[in-house]
């Protein structure tokens, strides 16, 4: 009995830390906590999902190109609905890059202050310290339509070969 309780507690603890990450063709990643999505398996799109958005290491920023400035949209009032896509602007030494969220009708809810203070985290640590922002959305199908890690890796490999 004690072992069973310990196993259930361990399973519960591990499930709280499980994240699902999906990738877009424009090299953005979105990660959601598994529990965040637990009520959405019935295709009910009214539940709010919180996701972390970032740029992958295969993104449009050259590893040797310093990010000078990042511009996020204004975080709007909770009740405001924005039909415009979420767009983040990255200024580098050589270019300005516009990143459009692959999730439709998402809302910016917080910005990674560390990335504003140290923009090169996007290059040096894109999947951990270099995350960009937190978004909320309600349609899990938008998230599920993105690529998983294997699909994304194959996409990147095939894209490099075609060039």
UniProtKB/Swiss-Prot annotation:
PANTHER family: GLYCINE CLEAVAGE SYSTEM H PROTEIN, GLYCINE CLEAVAGE SYSTEM H PROTEIN-RELATED. PROSITE patterns: BIOTINYL_LIPOYL. Residues 1-23 form a transit peptide. Residues 50-136 form the Lipoyl-binding domain. Its main location: mitochondrion. Belongs to the GcvH family. This is Glycine cleavage system H-like protein gcvH5, mitochondrial. It holds the Pfam family GCV_H. It is found in: Mitochondrion. InterPro entries: Biotin_lipoyl, GCV_H, GCV_H/Fam206, Single_hybrid_motif. Keywords: Mitochondrion, Transit peptide. GO terms for cellular component: glycine cleavage complex; mitochondrion. One of its GO terms (biological process) is glycine decarboxylation via glycine cleavage system.
């Amino acid at each position: 009995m004690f072992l069973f309780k310990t196993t259930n507690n361990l399973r519960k603890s591990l499930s709280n830390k499980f994240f699902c990450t999906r990738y877009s063709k424009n090299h953005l990643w979105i990660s959601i906590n598994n529990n965040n999505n637990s009520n959405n398996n019935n295709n009910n799109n009214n539940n709010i999902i919180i996701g972390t958005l970032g740029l992958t290491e295969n993104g449009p920023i050259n590893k040797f190109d310093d990010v000078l400035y990042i511009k996020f949209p204004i975080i709007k009032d909770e009740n405001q609905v924005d039909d415009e896509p979420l767009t983040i602007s990255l200024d580098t030494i050589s270019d300005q890059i516009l990143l459009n969220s692959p999730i439709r009708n998402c809302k910016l809810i917080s910005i990674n202050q560390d990335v504003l203070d140290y923009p090169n985290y996007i290059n040096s640590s894109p999947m951990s310290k270099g995350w960009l922002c937190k978004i909320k959305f309600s349609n899990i199908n938008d998230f599920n339509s993105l690529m998983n890690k294997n699909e994304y890796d194959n996409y990147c490999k095939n894209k490099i070969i075609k060039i």
